[in-house]
């Protein structure tokens, strides 16, 4: 695929210490039936992970700014948005609805839509019941 057309596709950056990171190392995500590239994902190697783990206390400090109840509420809201909302997709201004997520994941993984929806329901349940799990 041409570079210019790759630049219009959704790009999912790696996250480093809570911030998007546009890595030089990228993987193209392909629809299994059409062979069409549908997104590009930044990846990081073990060296970068090791470097970031040395600063893990920064992440802990950021989480300590919230109460447990606030984190549970944030998780529940995330679960609702995941199952029912339209969310940002990557760092190039794309968005994706839950139905689009089902079609995309089914197309790139080969899983039937019904299986993707079941897994979405499980993720939703886990996120909206964090308080019960804890």
Predicted regions, residues:
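N-terminal Rossmann-like NAD(P)+-binding subdomain of aldehyde/semialdehyde dehydrogenases
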Residues: 1-134
């Amino acid at each position: 695929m041409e570079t210019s057309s790759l630049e219009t596709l959704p790009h999912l950056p790696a996250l480093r210490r809570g911030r998007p990171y546009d890595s030089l190392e990228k993987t193209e995500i392909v629809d299994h039936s059409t062979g069409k590239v549908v997104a590009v994902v930044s990846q990081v190697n073990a060296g970068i992970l090791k470097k970031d783990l040395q600063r893990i206390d920064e992440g802990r400090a950021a989480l300590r700014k919230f109460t447990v109840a606030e984190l549970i509420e944030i998780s529940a809201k995330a679960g609702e948005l995941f199952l029912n909302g339209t969310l940002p997709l990557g760092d190039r201004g794309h968005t994706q609805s839950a139905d689009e997520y089902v079609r995309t994941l089914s197309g790139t993984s080969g899983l039937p839509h019904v299986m993707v929806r079941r897994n979405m329901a499980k993720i939703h349940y886990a996120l909206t019941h964090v308080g019960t799990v804890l």
